Amino acid sequence: LLEFIDRGAPAAPSPRPVAGVASAPAAHPAAEPWPGDRVEPWSRIRKLTADHMLMSRRVSAHVQTLFEVDYTQVARIRAGKKQEFAERGVNLTYLAFIAKAVAANLRRHPRLNAAVGADTTILRHEVNLGIAVALDWGLIVPVVKQADELSLLGLARAISDLGERARTKKLNPDEVQRGTFSITNPGVFGSLAGLPILNQPQ
């Protein structure tokens, strides 16, 4: 170090001439329709969903694990409560039980209710459950705010109300914002399991 200080830094070598700048790889070409094909333009929400999901795969590593759950007890409780809920104008679905269990456990295990910052983990104080709703024109995720504070009846009512207003395009902008954890139910399509993409920044 002392020798470097006495003599100074060595002269920088002359830069070598650059033969040429390599061009960036071309983007993957979009598919072109063939004769007889029908072309359906994307709705704005479908385009936004596609862009958001592609961004999510770049931001977060997606790792899935599956568990088998015995629903015998839940099915028994649902059968006993279904009429009572119906008399209050609420359809008691299995999804309400899942939402109740998820909300309680997110409060108990806050790291599951976290978001990824630039170089931080943000542990959310609120437990706001997004409930994915598949529509003919796209996918939307209305949010049940403060879900951990709701009873089973309250959750079932909120899920039913938000789902119906999503299908009739009557949601307010704030009802699809500030979600901390989303639930999707691929079983409605008859599948055994689904591996959804994270809805950032959840």
PLM regions with names:
Residues L1-R16:
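Intrinsically disordered, low-complexity glycine/proline-rich and charged
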Residues P13-Q202:
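C-terminal catalytic/motor cores of large multi-domain enzyme assemblies
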